Each structure stands twice: as structure tokens, then as C-alpha cells.
A protein has these predicted regions:
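Short, flexible, mixed-charge glycine/proline-rich loop motifs
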Residues: 14-20
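Short "domain-exit" segments at the C-terminal end of structured domains
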Residues: 9-12
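Active-site neighborhoods and metal-handling regions in enzymes and metal-associated proteins
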Residues: 20-21, 29-191
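Short, small-residue-biased leader/transition segments that mark boundaries at the very start
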Residues: 1-7
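Short cysteine-rich clusters marking metal-coordination/redox-active sites
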Residues: 25
Length: 192
């Protein structure tokens, strides 16, 4: 892995060095390189020369791409908000999947999970000790005392929004409530 990173990084350095000041920029903006990303790439090259790992150009987004990702995230949040009142005792995870697929399409999105590497459903729903990527089923009925994770990814205008939400079904044990609370606190620490 370390060798692959070195090879990848050296290729990136070569790519940056091969772009002329008046060539079109690598980002696809149509602008000349010197007016677009040249100063940015020079800073990146400086970091690379000092031994830092630097991101591939594909990881660097334009303002338009960032806005597209933001809009996809908003649509994905709409889906999670929509499904919230349906997550209750007696409902099957298969029904939640159907509702999510219908609503995602209704708001102009595409359920990204559906068909991804053969995944058969539009959302991942994990109950209790299923860590992630639980497959919804009409035979899986929500019961009081369970905790549930709905992991949803929405494609909107070619961009992906991805998030999950935890739910407590009915009367949940103190241990499970603590797990959900502490997990949320940990996630919030990432954004402070």
C-alpha cells in the first residue's frame, strides 16, 4: 500500500508538471491552467515535496460540484425526514423500503443502494445488533424494544447524498438508549 501511494503521488506530480500555464486546466472548467488551479497545485506540490500525502485531483471539487453534493444531501435528508413517522412497531422493513423508494423517485432522486453490487433494495435497514447494510424484508416486522438504523443514499442530478438515522422502537432498554445517545454524541464530536 505504501508503495502504491508513492507511485500514485509521483504520477500526480508528473501530471502537474506536464500541464503548461496556458493549457486548459485539468478540472474541466475550460479556463487556462494559470487562471484556474495553477497556484493551488503549486501549494499542493509544496506539501508533496515536504512529505505530506495529498489528495488526488478527483477529490478536489469545484464550487458547482460542492453545490450539487449539498443538494443531494438535502434530498437525502428529506427522505429520512419523510420516513420518520412510518418507523414504528408493527411495520415491516420491506414496507419502509417501498416507501423510501417511492418518495425518493417522487422528489426526483434515485435510490443509490438499489442494484449496487447486486444489493436488492433501495435502503439499508439494520435492526439491533446488525452492524450495517441490513436488507429490508416483508418478514422483518418492527417490535417494541428494538433499535433501528436506516442508512439511505440518494442520487440527485448525478451527485450522492448519504446519511443514516437511528430510531428507538417503543419501549427501549436503558442500555440501548445509552448506545444510541453515545453514538450520536460521538458523531457530533466530528463536527465541532
Amino acid at each position: 500500500r505504501q508503495r502504491q501511494m508513492c507511485i500514485r503521488d509521483s504520477r500526480k506530480k508528473d501530471l502537474i508538471m506536464k500541464i503548461g500555464r496556458n493549457d486548459k486546466c485539468w478540472c474541466g472548467s475550460g479556463k487556462k491552467y494559470k487562471a484556474c488551479h495553477m497556484s493551488f497545485d503549486n501549494r499542493i506540490k509544496d506539501y508533496w515535496n515536504r512529505g505530506y500525502e495529498v489528495p488526488d485531483h478527483s477529490m478536489i471539487k469545484t464550487p458547482e460540484q460542492i453545490e450539487g453534493i449539498r443538494e443531494a444531501g438535502k434530498k437525502n435528508t428529506m427522505v429520512l425526514d419523510f420516513i420518520t413517522p412510518y418507523v414504528k412497531e408493527g411495520v415491516s422493513t420491506g414496507e419502509l423500503n417501498r416507501l423510501i423508494e417511492e418518495y425518493t423517485r417522487e422528489i426526483g432522486g434515485i435510490p443509490a443502494c438499489l442494484g449496487y453490487q447486486g444489493y436488492p433494495k433501495s435502503v439499508c435497514i439494520s435492526i439491533d445488533d446488525v452492524v450495517c447494510h441490513g436488507i429490508p424484508s416483508d418478514h422483518q416486522i418492527l417490535k417494541s424494544g428494538q433499535i433501528l438504523n436506516v442508512d439511505c443514499t440518494t442520487i440527485y442530478n448525478g451527485y450522492f447524498g448519504d446519511a443514516s438515522r437511528m430510531f428507538c422502537i417503543g419501549d427501549v432498554s436503558e442500555e440501548k438508549k445509552k448506545l444510541v445517545r453515545v453514538t450520536k454524541e460521538c458523531v457530533c464530536l466530528l463536527y465541532t
